[in-house]
Amino acid sequence: MKEKVVLAYSGGLDTTAIIPWLKETFDYEVICCCIDCGQGNELVGLDERAKLSGASKLYIENVIDEFSEDFIMPCVKAGAVYENKYLLGTSMARPVIAKKLVEIARKEGAVAICHGATGKGNDQIRFELGIKALAPDIKVIAPWRMTDVWTMQYREDELAYCKAHGIDLPFDANHSYSRDRNLWHISHEGLELEDPSNEPNYDDLLVLTTPPEKAPDEGEYVTMTFEAGVPKTLNGKEMKVSEIITELNKLGGKHGIGIVDIVENRVVGMKSRGVYETPGGTILMAAHEQLEELILDRETLKTKKDLGNLLAEVVYEGKWYTPLREAIQAFVDVTQKYVTGEVKFKLFKGNIIKAGESSPYSLYNESLASFTTGDLYDHHDADGFITLFGLPLKVRAMKMQELEKNNNK
């Protein structure tokens, strides 16, 4: 009986070419596994394609709800954004994919897991750190780093290899954008984006989102409610998290929300440029933040922001299955206990405009915030506070005056 390998399979040219290569190079039985994180119609026809390419079996695992609730929401609650722009769409998906690959490898008794990530990108790190953390005994095969036996460098090479092995599938020989899509976002790299001086060709590029200048001339109001930091209703209708994200994608896409052009610092040291469409995610993050500012005290909000930035780095670097990620998430979960309430905002030509928020746990006190005198706050109380709060500044200034006077003698 042949040993088995589980291949992370997308149905694209790279992973299709890997199937006969694994059989030819290692004499493995190839079990393909496609993890459905919300790719949509990209999954159509995969079973036939995998088997025509030589796989003995294809698993299509729907993890959309798990991805939404256990991977997306911890990052939303933390406000995790990498380098102030990137909402971690690809980064959050890789650990759930790694988890399912390991589960299927265990079920099939496979000795190895194979992925098609290149040797220059972040995904190789994310996949392999996840697999190492969950199954240190399982071998990982990364063809693009095995240049002694993987000789295909270009798309044309892969097409020729497939054809030579009897795989005649309708792959496009032309170069196109490199895209990664899931429920949360779609990323675009390649072509004109490789030169950061070029403006993206948005008419050809965008998939989910209308360019803001072409969005409707009339704004649209949206209302959301949250319980303990988790979205529960959208425009009065109760939904699962995944359903809310799906609907927000439609609304945000219609109004040109969530297009980001970023030059980011990859884990491997190089800079890369990409355009990300995250319409629903951008709205959800903004709505959650809008409610938090009403509820969390200053020091908690500040500390949470710092840890949110740290979590973004941890997730981006593929360190989901670590004590550090668990510890950050535990802190964030405590802060979310009272993040309950309603937010309202208007979507208009790429903008999310606040239109009110309320919460039974709001720390906003109108009598305190107003400029009139109230029972809870006496303007005279500020005298003592400013004296003490400014004491270090005053002491330093006095010392500087003393030193200057002595120097002038």
Task: Please identify what each model-predicted range represents.
Residues 2-409:
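Nucleotide-activated chemistry modules centered on ATP-dependent adenylation/adenylyltransferase
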